[in-house]
UniProtKB/Swiss-Prot annotation:
This is Small ribosomal subunit protein eS1. The gene is rps3ae. One of its GO terms (biological process) is translation. GO terms for molecular function: structural constituent of ribosome. Belongs to the eukaryotic ribosomal protein eS1 family.
């Protein structure tokens, strides 16, 4: 004979849980990006939420950028987040790469004015194939441009510049004098830690 399922305790646990609205930081207009459920508000802190930039700023031409936010504060039924990284989708990146051209990837750690360490990945696409010395020179120029921009910006401004494409435009200007460049894209960023002073 089949046993009866015990659903009472499971149902009680579910009823004890509460829904929280999740908001992005002020830098992105404190938009609501979704809901999360938890029995204890303290369990919410540290959770990672993802959303596309298109959803955050209501501009769906930017849906290829995936944003990551970490919940750092819960007040009432609202959960507030901080930016911890972004990534460009692989499909978008693949569509940019052309034949008979070089793709130059640079991963560089930068420290903002308020001492936050961010690891940034930049992809630089050339018009024609570059040799090894040109690739090295381009990577150096990218690293210098990133470090200089980060040193004069606080974390919030730095993140805005990265996600909006302003920093990529500055890097493009710095690099195009070295070798003919078709495009520069900051494809990934990740908040590592608060940098040591």
């Amino acid at each position: 004979m089949a046993r009866k399922k015990q659903v009472g305790r499971r149902l009680e646990g579910w009823k004890a849980k509460k829904w929280y609205r999740v908001y992005v930081p002020d830098a992105f207009g404190k938009a609501e990006i979704g809901d999360a459920i938890s029995a204890d508000p303290e369990n919410m802190v540290g959770r990672i939420m993802t959303a596309t930039l298109g959803e955050v700023v209501q501009d769906y031409s930017k849906s290829h950028i995936k944003m990551r936010f970490k919940i750092n504060n819960v007040a009432g039924d609202a959960a507030y987040t901080e930016f911890v990284g972004h990534e460009v989708t692989r499909d978008y990146l693949r569509s940019m790469v052309k034949r008979r051209a070089s793709r130059i990837d640079t991963i560089h750690p930068v420290v903002s004015k308020d001492k936050k360490l961010l690891r940034v990945t930049v992809v630089c696409l050339t018009l024609s194939r570059a040799d090894q010395s040109q690739v090295h020179a381009v990577r150096q120029a990218i690293s210098q441009a990133l470090s200089a921009r980060a040193a004069e910006s606080d974390f919030e401004t730095l993140v805005k510049d990265i996600v909006s494409g302003d920093m990529a435009r500055d890097i493009f200007k710095a690099v195009k004098t070295i070798y003919p460049i078709r495009r520069v894209e900051i494809t990934k960023s990740k908040l590592e830690q608060v940098a040591a002073v």
